[in-house]
Design a protein with these regions (language model features):
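C-terminal motif of bacterial Sec signal peptides marking the signal peptidase cleavage site
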Residues: 15-18
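Subset-of-secretome marker
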Residues: 2-4, 20-265
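N-terminal export and membrane-targeting signals
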Residues: 1-11
Length: 265
C-alpha cells in the first residue's frame, strides 16, 4: 500500500475514540450480576462526569494494515462547555513524521496538516469544517476530527480486573464492551460507514471519579483497506483552563470547497 493511501486510515483511529463526547447519561446495566452492574454504573458515571469538564488528553496509537504500520502520538486540551480546544498529533510512517493540528472554536473546527497541504489553494493552511454537518457532508474521517480527544462511548458488561497507578493517581482497572445502542445516530452512521468493530475496552477510573486512562482496540475499513487499530488515551488536568488561538481568516478555506481523499462522503 502506498504511504498516502495508508495515511487515509489514520482518521479511523480517531474515529474509534470519538464517540463519547456528547455527554450522554450513564448507561443502565443489562448484566445479571451485582458486581458487574456496580462496575458498569461506576465506569459510565466516570465517563459522564469527565465529559462535562475541560481536560488534557495524551494519545498514542498504532494502525496496522497490509503489513504496514502507522504510529501516532499527540495531545489535546478541550473544554466541552465553551466548545474550545487544541489538538496536535504526529503520525509516523516510513521514517517520516506527519503533523496534524486542530483548533476547535465553538461550532467550527480548523485542521492543518502537511498530509493534505498540496490540495489547498495558495496561501491557505487550514481546512475549516462545520461541526454540526461534518459527518453528513464530509464522511466519517471529518466526523472523527470534530470529536473530543480521549472521549469514550457508553459501556456495558463492565468487570473489574485490577488496580494501577496512572500519572501518580491510584486507579481501578476495568474491562468492558461498547454499548452501541447508546450511541447517537451520527455516531452510529460514522461507525457503520467505516465498518468499525470494537474489541474489549480497558478503562482506568481514579478514586476522584474520573477516567484517567482508556485503551480501545478496533478494526475498521477505508478505501477498501482493512486496519487493526489500538489507541491509548491518558487524561489529566480535569477542570483546567483551555486557551485557543483561532487561525487567521486569510489562511483558512471551507472544506466543502476542497476535494481531499478521506474527507468526502
Amino acid at each position: 500500500m502506498r504511504g498516502r493511501a495508508l495515511l487515509l486510515l489514520v482518521p479511523l483511529a480517531l474515529l474509534a475514540t470519538a464517540c463519547g463526547s456528547g455527554g450522554s447519561k450513564p448507561a443502565a446495566s443489562s448484566t445479571t450480576t451485582t458486581s458487574s452492574a456496580n462496575a458498569t454504573a461506576t465506569v459510565n458515571q466516570a465517563i459522564a462526569k469527565g465529559a462535562k469538564q475541560p481536560v488534557h488528553a495524551a494519545v498514542s496509537g498504532l494502525v496496522t494494515a497490509s503489513g504496514q504500520q502507522i504510529r501516532m502520538s499527540g495531545s489535546g486540551d478541550v473544554d466541552p462547555k465553551s466548545q474550545t480546544g487544541t489538538i496536535h498529533v504526529s503520525i509516523g510512517l516510513g521514517g517520516q513524521q506527519v503533523p496534524l493540528d486542530e483548533v476547535l472554536d465553538g461550532k467550527t473546527v480548523y485542521v492543518s496538516s502537511s498530509f493534505f497541504s498540496s490540495f489547498l489553494p495558495s496561501g491557505k493552511k487550514w481546512l475549516k469544517l462545520d461541526v454540526a454537518s461534518a459527518s453528513n457532508t464530509f464522511g466519517p474521517a471529518a466526523f472523527a476530527l470534530t470529536e473530543k480527544p480521549g472521549a469514550l462511548p457508553p459501556l456495558q458488561d463492565v468487570h473489574q480486573v485490577g488496580t494501577a497507578t496512572v500519572d501518580g493517581v491510584q486507579t481501578t482497572k476495568y474491562s468492558a464492551k461498547v454499548d452501541r445502542s447508546k450511541l447517537s445516530p451520527a455516531q452510529k452512521s460514522a461507525l457503520k460507514s467505516s465498518h468499525v468493530t470494537f474489541g474489549t475496552i480497558e478503562v482506568w477510573v481514579g478514586s476522584d471519579g474520573y477516567v484517567h486512562r482508556a485503551r480501545i482496540e478496533t478494526s475498521a475499513q477505508a478505501g477498501g483497506q482493512k486496519a487493526n487499530i489500538a489507541v491509548t488515551s491518558t487524561m489529566s488536568n480535569y477542570g483546567e483552563s483551555v486557551q485557543v488561538t483561532v487561525p487567521p481568516a486569510g489562511q483558512t478555506v471551507d472544506a466543502s470547497k476542497v476535494g481531499i481523499p478521506g474527507f468526502s462522503s
